[in-house]
């Protein structure tokens, strides 16, 4: 429940960001007050703005378009896409802490991968994550059948799929809110999106083969500055950078020709509470690189 703005409920609703959030109920009569077509948009599973100038009043609403798409999987109305493109250069005006919150809400959503794809179509994604420009320059190769940008989004999708298929114990672990007010799963999907950011700067081609030597170490170091710029906490930064640094480690352990209980226990001791998370990220990475 939010405090009303304006001298009538209708004026208040017209100041909201999206039609699906601009619906009220008269508690005395039970009448639904919907002056922007929000009920119809919910039925049609469509995200649309109430008034495009509301994006100017608070540009964070540009990001909220994709946060709600990540949550519900709804399509975006063409006029909303056009408005986001029109005002995308305003996205840096809100406080960084507010942007951080919306990003993690987005990655909390089941359909985060869809939202990321659509953010890319309106330039918002590169405004928030400049490293995306570098991801797009690495083409499909023997390591992944997609270009690096789409491989990264596919990895986010595969993390969500693995979570959906996981046991109750694993889901309980990933649902824990250990840092930043958001679940481990949300942070793991953000790490999945960033897991290969070190590849562009380590990219070489030798005898036709693409190599990315130590991209995991380089990416982990790069992520620290990116996450600090987003005002993430030290715990959030430690977790995400650790996932990036060790996203190949579980695969090396599991594919070792001489895997032993000692090797497995060394992995568990090293990764500690993040053992399951790293395994899921490594598996998602492999599933995204067929």
Task: Walk through the language-model features, giving the residues of each.
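Catalytic cores of the polymerase beta-like nucleotidyltransferase superfamily
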Residues: 1-290
């Amino acid at each position: 429940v939010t405090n009303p703005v304006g001298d009538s409920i209708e004026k208040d609703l017209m100041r909201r960001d999206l039609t699906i959030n601009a619906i009220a109920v008269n508690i005395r009569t039970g009448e639904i007050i919907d002056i922007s077509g929000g009920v119809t948009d919910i039925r049609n599973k469509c995200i649309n703005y109430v008034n495009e100038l509301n994006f100017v009043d608070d540009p964070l609403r540009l990001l909220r378009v994709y946060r709600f798409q990540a949550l519900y999987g709804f399509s975006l109305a063409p006029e909303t896409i056009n408005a986001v493109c029109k005002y995308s250069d305003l996205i840096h005006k809100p406080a960084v802490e507010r942007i951080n919150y919306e990003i993690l809400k987005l990655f909390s959503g089941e359909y985060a991968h869809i939202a990321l794809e659509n953010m890319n179509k309106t330039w918002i994604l590169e405004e928030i994550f400049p490293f995306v420009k570098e991801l797009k320059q690495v083409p499909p190769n023997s390591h992944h059948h997609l270009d690096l940008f789409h491989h990264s989004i596919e990895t986010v999708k595969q993390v969500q799929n693995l979570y959906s298929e996981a046991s109750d114990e694993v889901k309980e672990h990933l649902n824990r809110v250990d840092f930043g007010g958001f679940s481990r799963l949300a942070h793991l999907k953000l790490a999945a999106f960033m897991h290969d950011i070190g590849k562009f700067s380590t990219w070489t081609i030798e005898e036709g083969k693409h190599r990315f030597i130590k991209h995991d170490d380089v990416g982990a170091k790069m992520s620290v500055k990116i996450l600090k710029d987003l005002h993430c906490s030290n715990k959030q930064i430690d977790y995400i950078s650790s996932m990036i640094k060790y996203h190949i480690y579980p695969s090396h352990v599991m594919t070792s020709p001489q895997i032993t209980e000692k090797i497995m226990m060394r992995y568990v001791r090293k990764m500690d509470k993040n053992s399951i998370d790293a395994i899921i990220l490594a598996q998602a990475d492999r599933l995204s690189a067929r």
